[in-house]
Amino acid sequence: MAQAVWSRLGRILWLACLLPWAPAGVAAGLYELNLTTDSPATTGAVVTISASLVAKDNGSLALPADAHLYRFHWIHTPLVLTGKMEKGLSSTIRVVGHVPGEFPVSVWVTAADCWMCQPVARGFVVLPITEFLVGDLVVTQNTSLPWPSSYLTKTVLKVSFLLHDPSNFLKTALFLYSWDFGDGTQMVTEDSVVYYNYSIIGTFTVKLKVVAEWEEVEPDATRAVKQKTGDFSASLKLQETLRGIQVLGPTLIQTFQKMTVTLNFLGSPPLTVCWRLKPECLPLEEGECHPVSVASTAYNLTHTFRDPGDYCFSIRAENIISKTHQYHKIQVWPSRIQPAVFAFPCATLITVMLAFIMYMTLRNATQQKDMVEVADFDFSPMSDKNPEPPSGVRCCCQMCCGPFLLETPSEYLEIVRENHGLLPPLYKSVKTYTV
């Protein structure tokens, strides 16, 4: 019985010890810390870090009315703490780094009367500390281009160096700026702002070297000159606006005739070109044609018209800076001979005519010869004593056996000529013999 009483009493005492932890335990997981810092910083400069307790559900959960119920705890080693301030549900510390590196800083919030209790919220941040100057190189131009790092040629550029020194660590320093614009131009100024005008297109890198010098009092009361440097750069892409499109091509053409149109772009590539044939010269709408990427300032279009009529080439070109439109009217006339219909018949007719001419030429060359008949009259008395055989027998013998009986080919040719005879006489001649 006594043991049961002591057991119950121990439980009551345990719960009593846990009562101070109840608010923090209930609040755990409901809040979070928002951390802000003005880093990065150079060695020796003061860095400010702030932490604010906020609700996780974007403000619908009410924050504690009494800010003294909670306490902020910081860990910032090896950074040196130079100041701390708490106001309401926020806390701010200032630290200095004397060596370069990346240093973690953590913070958490607990109940004010129990720093060993479970944290209500935690936060963590890394501070980059460098031995060089910290800043940004900013390039601006009096144009509203939507593309980053793209600028116009022959238009003034403003190049500025913005030093990042929120703690005014370098407020007494003297600065010297060495500029290199990437096109062979260099200059040295004491001003952090310069103006420059690029005359050619291309990609350039602006380089800047900054030197800061100041005097600092040493622990032994002597003055020493301190120096810090920094190197910065920015990449620039200089473009030319599309001032227009020059179209070179015919304005009158026949159907079934291939046409080539050359487009000369007055601007800097790369370009996106889109074109379409329309009955009228109207601008192209978005999605009305298929865009083509062009890496040069010239482009050739080829097209073959099949139907006569009036047409218009609607052309649109754009680069990363601007866009332009151009139009080119074409009048298409019907062709006199449709090649698709008459090409084969014409070729066949020409071939037949050539073959016929060649045949007639060869035939005339082999058959047209001049015939000369030779008459040999023998008036000697012996001519009647040896009468010739009948003409039929003679012709047959000469025609069939002449080549074999005669001694020379010339005799054979004379026989052939005699067989043809002269023109028939108008009257029949009568032989008269004298004895």
From Swiss-Prot:
One of its GO terms (cellular component) is plasma membrane. Glycans are attached at N34, N197, N300. It is a single-pass type I membrane protein. It is found in: Golgi apparatus membrane. Residues 25-339 are extracellular. Pfam families: PKAT_KLD. The keyword Membrane applies. PROSITE patterns: PKD. The chain crosses the membrane at residues 340-360. Residues 361-435 are cytoplasmic. The keyword Disulfide bond does not apply. Residues 147-233 form the PKD domain. Residues 1-24 form the signal peptide. Its main location: Golgi. Keywords: Glycoprotein, Golgi apparatus, Membrane, Signal, Transmembrane, Transmembrane helix. This is Transmembrane protein 130. It comes from Homo sapiens. The lineage of its organism: Eukaryota, Metazoa, Chordata, Craniata, Vertebrata.
